[in-house]
Protein backbone atom coordinates (compact mmCIF):
# COMPACT_ATOMS: atom_id res chain seq x y z
CA UNK A 1 0.00 0.00 0.00
CA UNK A 2 1.31 3.47 -0.86
CA UNK A 3 1.45 5.82 2.14
CA UNK A 4 3.02 8.84 0.46
CA UNK A 5 4.61 10.17 -2.71
CA UNK A 6 6.89 13.18 -3.06
CA UNK A 7 9.05 14.72 -5.75
CA UNK A 8 11.37 17.70 -5.98
CA UNK A 9 13.45 19.45 -8.61
CA UNK A 10 16.55 21.35 -7.49
CA UNK A 11 18.75 23.70 -9.49
CA UNK A 12 22.36 22.49 -9.20
CA UNK A 13 23.74 25.97 -9.94
CA UNK A 14 21.65 27.46 -7.12
CA UNK A 15 22.97 24.82 -4.70
CA UNK A 16 26.51 25.55 -5.91
CA UNK A 17 26.05 29.29 -5.27
CA UNK A 18 24.65 28.51 -1.81
CA UNK A 19 27.66 26.29 -1.06
CA UNK A 20 30.01 29.06 -2.22
CA UNK A 21 28.24 31.70 -0.17
CA UNK A 22 27.51 29.82 3.06
CA UNK A 23 29.96 26.89 2.95
CA UNK A 24 30.04 24.74 6.08
CA UNK A 25 27.17 26.65 7.65
CA UNK A 26 24.87 25.37 4.88
CA UNK A 27 26.45 21.90 4.70
CA UNK A 28 26.21 21.33 8.44
CA UNK A 29 22.64 22.59 8.68
CA UNK A 30 21.26 20.40 5.88
CA UNK A 31 23.49 17.36 5.37
CA UNK A 32 24.73 14.58 7.64
CA UNK A 33 28.45 13.86 7.94
CA UNK A 34 28.02 10.78 5.76
CA UNK A 35 26.26 12.80 3.05
CA UNK A 36 28.98 15.44 3.19
CA UNK A 37 31.79 12.87 2.89
CA UNK A 38 30.07 11.29 -0.11
CA UNK A 39 29.53 14.64 -1.86
CA UNK A 40 33.06 15.88 -1.21
CA UNK A 41 34.51 12.71 -2.81
CA UNK A 42 32.56 13.27 -6.03
CA UNK A 43 33.77 15.32 -8.98
CA UNK A 44 30.30 16.89 -9.24
CA UNK A 45 30.07 17.96 -5.60
CA UNK A 46 27.26 20.47 -6.15
CA UNK A 47 25.25 17.94 -8.17
CA UNK A 48 25.59 15.36 -5.42
CA UNK A 49 24.42 17.86 -2.80
CA UNK A 50 21.56 19.00 -5.07
CA UNK A 51 20.28 15.43 -5.51
CA UNK A 52 20.33 14.90 -1.75
CA UNK A 53 18.60 18.25 -1.17
CA UNK A 54 15.88 17.20 -3.63
CA UNK A 55 15.58 13.80 -1.93
CA UNK A 56 15.04 15.41 1.47
CA UNK A 57 12.40 17.76 0.04
CA UNK A 58 10.68 14.85 -1.73
CA UNK A 59 10.76 12.74 1.43
CA UNK A 60 9.26 15.53 3.52
CA UNK A 61 6.44 15.79 0.97
CA UNK A 62 5.89 12.01 1.01
CA UNK A 63 5.68 12.21 4.81
CA UNK A 64 2.87 14.73 4.29
CA UNK A 65 4.51 17.45 6.35
CA UNK A 66 7.05 19.32 4.29
CA UNK A 67 9.82 20.73 6.46
CA UNK A 68 7.63 21.62 9.42
CA UNK A 69 6.06 19.89 12.41
CA UNK A 70 9.52 19.52 13.95
CA UNK A 71 11.06 17.68 10.99
CA UNK A 72 14.54 18.96 10.19
CA UNK A 73 16.85 18.45 7.23
CA UNK A 74 19.10 16.04 9.10
CA UNK A 75 16.14 13.86 10.12
CA UNK A 76 16.35 12.53 6.54
CA UNK A 77 19.60 11.10 5.16
CA UNK A 78 20.49 9.57 1.81
CA UNK A 79 23.12 6.87 1.50
CA UNK A 80 23.72 4.13 -1.05
CA UNK A 81 23.64 0.35 -1.13
CA UNK A 82 26.71 -1.42 -2.53
CA UNK A 83 24.89 -1.55 -5.87
CA UNK A 84 24.72 2.26 -5.87
CA UNK A 85 20.96 2.31 -5.22
CA UNK A 86 20.07 5.32 -3.07
CA UNK A 87 18.26 4.67 0.21
CA UNK A 88 16.65 7.07 2.66
CA UNK A 89 16.94 6.74 6.43
CA UNK A 90 14.79 8.80 8.74
CA UNK A 91 15.39 9.68 12.39
CA UNK A 92 13.92 12.05 14.94
CA UNK A 93 10.59 13.65 14.08
CA UNK A 94 10.65 12.23 10.54
CA UNK A 95 10.87 8.70 11.96
CA UNK A 96 8.06 9.51 14.40
CA UNK A 97 5.88 10.77 11.54
CA UNK A 98 6.66 7.61 9.55
CA UNK A 99 5.60 5.46 12.53
CA UNK A 100 2.34 7.44 12.80
CA UNK A 101 1.61 6.88 9.09
CA UNK A 102 2.31 3.15 9.13
CA UNK A 103 -0.68 0.91 9.90
CA UNK A 104 -0.31 -1.67 12.66
CA UNK A 105 1.01 -4.97 11.30
CA UNK A 106 2.91 -3.24 8.49
CA UNK A 107 6.45 -2.04 7.95
CA UNK A 108 7.28 1.15 6.08
CA UNK A 109 9.71 1.04 3.16
CA UNK A 110 11.04 4.27 1.66
CA UNK A 111 11.93 4.06 -2.03
CA UNK A 112 14.01 6.89 -3.49
CA UNK A 113 15.36 7.56 -6.94
CA UNK A 114 17.73 10.37 -7.92
CA UNK A 115 18.70 11.78 -11.28
CA UNK A 116 20.35 14.86 -12.71
CA UNK A 117 20.74 16.57 -16.05
CA UNK A 118 22.62 19.82 -15.53
CA UNK A 119 21.41 22.24 -14.28
CA UNK A 120 18.64 20.11 -12.71
CA UNK A 121 18.64 17.43 -10.01
CA UNK A 122 15.47 15.50 -9.30
CA UNK A 123 14.32 13.08 -6.62
CA UNK A 124 11.22 10.97 -6.33
CA UNK A 125 10.20 9.26 -3.07
CA UNK A 126 7.52 6.64 -2.50
CA UNK A 127 6.69 5.44 1.00
CA UNK A 128 5.20 1.96 0.94
CA UNK A 129 3.63 -0.09 3.73
CA UNK A 130 4.14 -3.86 3.51
CA UNK A 131 2.61 -6.48 5.79
CA UNK A 132 5.08 -7.73 8.38
CA UNK A 133 6.44 -11.20 7.64
CA UNK A 134 4.85 -14.05 9.60
CA UNK A 135 7.05 -15.99 12.04
CA UNK A 136 9.39 -18.18 10.00
CA UNK A 137 8.60 -16.26 6.81
CA UNK A 138 11.33 -14.20 5.17
CA UNK A 139 10.62 -10.88 3.47
CA UNK A 140 13.12 -11.06 0.60
CA UNK A 141 12.16 -7.70 -0.86
CA UNK A 142 13.36 -5.58 2.07
CA UNK A 143 16.47 -3.60 1.07
CA UNK A 144 19.84 -4.55 2.50
CA UNK A 145 21.35 -2.17 5.06
CA UNK A 146 23.04 0.85 3.50
CA UNK A 147 26.77 1.07 3.01
CA UNK A 148 28.26 3.74 5.23
Curated annotation (Swiss-Prot):
Coiled coil: none annotated. The keyword Cytoplasm applies. Its main location: cytoplasm. Its cofactor is Mg(2+). Mg(2+) binds at residues 8, 57. It is found in: Cytoplasm. GO terms for cellular component: cytoplasm. It catalyses: apo-[ACP] + CoA = holo-[ACP] + adenosine 3',5'-bisphosphate + H(+). Keywords: Cytoplasm, Fatty acid biosynthesis, Fatty acid metabolism, Lipid biosynthesis, Lipid metabolism, Magnesium, Metal-binding, Transferase. One of its GO terms (biological process) is fatty acid biosynthetic process. Its EC number is 2.7.8.7. One of its GO terms (molecular function) is holo-[acyl-carrier-protein] synthase activity. SUPFAM superfamilies: 4'-phosphopantetheinyl transferase (SSF56214). InterPro entries: 4-PPantetheinyl_Trfase_dom, 4-PPantetheinyl_Trfase_dom_sf, ACPS, Ppantetheine-prot_Trfase_dom. It is an enzyme of class 2 (transferase). Belongs to the P-Pant transferase superfamily. AcpS family. Transfers the 4'-phosphopantetheine moiety from coenzyme A to a Ser of acyl-carrier-protein. This is Holo-[acyl-carrier-protein] synthase. It comes from Ruegeria pomeroyi (strain ATCC 700808 / DSM 15171 / DSS-3). The gene is acpS.
Amino acid sequence: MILGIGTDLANIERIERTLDRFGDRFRNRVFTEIEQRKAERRSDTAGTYAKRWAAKEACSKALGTGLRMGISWKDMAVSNLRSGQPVMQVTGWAAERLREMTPEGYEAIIHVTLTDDHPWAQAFVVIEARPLAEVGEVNLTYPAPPRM
